[in-house]
Each structure stands twice: as structure tokens, then as C-alpha cells.
């Protein structure tokens, strides 16, 4: 088998190995839903903007007016998230009873991890600052996923979704 045999074997091996990544990528892509998060910039931006607005409204409130906070977010959330948010706000109310404290949340980074024609999953990172009279502001970070669905008026929080705190409890 001289040099000529080695060259043919090398070419065949190169073709087989060169096609392997395409086969693996093709098989993986076949299992994935039609994710347009990195392709459809306009829809990605709309879903991301809506998720940021919902998140900042949910997590910015004052202890002086928690009933108003509940009313304000009533139109933003549905389904399981209504129950989960009521529990979170109830815990907050217990923790700040008799205190004057305001929480302001700002989404610092976000990204759409899934986008198809009817659904978007948005990963959000936020900083929440608390201010009390006579004290320096304090900050903490959080991250979670918010699922949105496409409705007649645009992107809205999905009925069956809750805030996925990514394992943080």
C-alpha cells in the first residue's frame, strides 16, 4: 500500500470525520423546536421589551401602598403567576409591616432563550434596591425566566407560567 494507498485512506477518513459534525448538528437541530430567538430580531425585541416591563412592574413597590401594587399588576399577570405573586407579596407585606420601605427593580440584562410564533421564554437578571428613611439603600440581585405567549394585543405573560427562579429559594 504505498503513498497512494495512504492518501486515499486519508481522504476517506477526512471526509467521514468532516461530515460527522454536520450529522450530529443536524440530528440535534431536528430535536429542537423552531427557535427563532436569534433570527427574528423584531419579535425577539418585542418579547424582551414586554418581559422587562412586566418584571419591573412586578418587583417595584412601596410598603405604604401594597393594595395599589396588587391592582396595578392585575392586568399584567394571569394563571399560576397570580397565585405565586400573591404569596410573594404577602411575604413582603409581613416582612415590612410597620416600616417605610420602597423597592425599585431594574432589569440589568435579559435575553430571549426561546422564540416561536406563539411563545417566548425570556431570561432576566435584575437588581432590586430597597430604600428606607434615614438608611443607605441596599441592593440584591435575582434571575428568573418569564414565559410569554402571543395574544391579540402582543406578548403577554403565559397563563400556565410562573416565575422560574432558576433553583433559588
Question: Over which residues does each language-model region extend?
Answer:
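Solvent-exposed, non-transmembrane alpha-helical starts
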Residues: 133-139
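Structural motif
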Residues: 119-123, 139-145, 155
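Core segments of small alpha/beta cavity-forming domains
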Residues: 42-98, 102
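Hydrophobic/aromatic beta-strand elements that line small-molecule binding cavities or substrate pockets
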Residues: 107-112, 142-148
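Surface-exposed, charged secondary-structure patches
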Residues: 98-133
Amino acid at each position: 500500500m504505498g503513498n497512494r494507498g495512504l492518501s486515499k485512506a486519508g481522504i476517506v477518513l477526512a471526509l467521514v470525520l468532516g461530515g460527522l459534525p454536520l450529522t450530529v448538528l443536524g440530528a440535534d437541530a431536528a430535536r429542537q423546536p423552531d427557535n427563532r430567538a436569534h433570527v427574528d430580531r423584531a419579535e425577539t425585541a418585542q418579547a424582551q421589551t414586554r418581559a422587562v416591563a412586566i418584571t419591573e412592574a412586578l418587583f417595584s413597590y412601596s410598603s405604604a401602598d401594597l393594595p395599589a401594587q396588587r391592582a396595578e399588576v392585575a392586568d399584567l399577570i394571569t394563571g399560576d403567576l397570580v397565585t405565586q405573586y400573591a404569596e410573594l407579596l404577602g411575604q413582603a407585606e409581613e416582612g415590612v409591616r410597620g416600616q417605610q420601605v420602597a423597592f425599585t427593580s431594574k432589569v440589568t440584562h435579559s435575553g430571549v432563550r426561546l422564540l416561536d410564533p406563539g411563545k417566548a421564554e425570556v431570561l432576566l437578571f435584575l437588581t432590586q434596591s430597597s430604600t428606607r428613611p434615614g438608611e443607605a439603600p441596599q441592593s440584591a440581585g435575582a434571575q428568573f425566566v418569564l414565559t410569554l405567549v402571543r395574544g391579540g394585543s402582543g406578548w403577554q405573560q403565559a397563563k400556565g407560567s410562573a416565575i422560574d427562579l432558576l433553583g433559588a429559594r
